Regions:
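Short, structured beta-strand/loop micro-motifs enriched in basic residues and often containing a Trp
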Residues: 1-15, 141-152
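N-terminal capping segments
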Residues: 38-145, 169, 186
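Glycine-centered loop/turn motifs
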Residues: 27, 98, 162-163
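A structural detector for beta-sheet-dominated domains
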Residues: 4-5, 33, 54-56
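...with weaker cross-activation on analogous glycine-rich loops/strands in unrelated enzymes
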Residues: 128-196
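Aromatic- and glycine-rich peptidoglycan recognition patches
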Residues: 1, 59-62, 68, 77-79, ...
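Short alpha-helical segments in extracytoplasmic peptidoglycan/chitin-binding modules
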Residues: 27, 115-116, 173
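Conserved beta-strand/loop element in small beta-rich adapter and peptidoglycan-binding domains
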Residues: 13-44
Length: 232
């Protein structure tokens, strides 16, 4: 069972604190303990309209153990990995818009590379956690556009489907499509200067913005893009 929503918590369980209100986040996978539709008692509660999953935990002696838990069928989950399409990438990305940015997982939130990693993990695609490692993917997947002019980059990106990955040193984002000739991206952003402004803002949000926003050095994100990563 794959979590395809941004996050949710399991129901409170008065008999098993290790799974009570446990938070599950996008891309997490849990094995099914029983076939979907199975009805049985789990710690005194019948499993109607729930998936029964195995949650890995640590036993008192330090060994691995699994605890059965119930996941309501109303939660945003998928049996098995989602089919990989770029439309599905955008659908998943949209579920994170407006959430707080958290560098390295601070504030129980995502930074730019964690966001991209978790979205793609829903398809069974395991990307590197760090931006620097992501940029080192083989040429088969990562096209180097660092030597192109700004307009050539714009045309190259315009030819790509929304959902591909764009990156430059220190930041990674998902191409979100275009509004006319304006390129848009979705990312967990820390800071940038808005279009037609030189003043850097503390953004700290997952949002859709123009690739014409600027870094502190004055470069636009479009000018800074070095790699286009396309899977499939």
């Amino acid at each position: 069972l794959v979590v395809t929503g941004s996050s949710f918590r399991l129901c409170r369980d008065p008999y098993e604190p290790l799974v009570s209100e446990l938070e599950l986040t996008m891309g997490m996978r849990l094995s099914l303990a029983e076939k979907p539709g199975t009805v049985k008692s789990v710690r005194g509660r019948m499993s109607y309209d729930n998936y029964i999953v195995n949650v890995p935990s640590r036993a008192a002696d330090g060994s691995l153990k699994f605890i059965e838990a119930l996941v309501p069928i109303s939660r945003d989950v998928h049996i098995g990995y989602m089919p990989f399409t770029y439309s599905n990438v955008i659908r998943l990305a949209d579920k994170t818009r407006g959430e707080i940015y958290g560098w390295g997982g601070m504030l129980d939130a995502r930074d730019c590379s964690a966001l991209v990693m978790e979205i793609y993990r829903c398809f069974g695609i395991m990307l590197p956690r760090n931006t620097s490692d992501l940029a080192k993917l083989p040429e088969k997947y990562a096209a180097d556009v660092s030597s192109l002019s700004t307009e050539a980059k714009r045309e190259t990106i315009l030819s790509q489907p929304a959902g591909v990955i764009l990156c430059f040193p220190g930041h990674v984002m998902i191409y979100y499509g275009s509004d006319g000739n304006e390129l848009l991206c979705l990312s967990a952003a820390g800071k940038f200067a808005p279009v037609q402004s030189s003043a850097t803002q503390n953004v700290y949000t997952v949002e859709v913005c123009s690739l014409d926003v600027r870094l502190s050095n004055g470069k636009t994100w479009l000018e800074a893009v070095e790699k286009i990563i396309r899977i499939g």
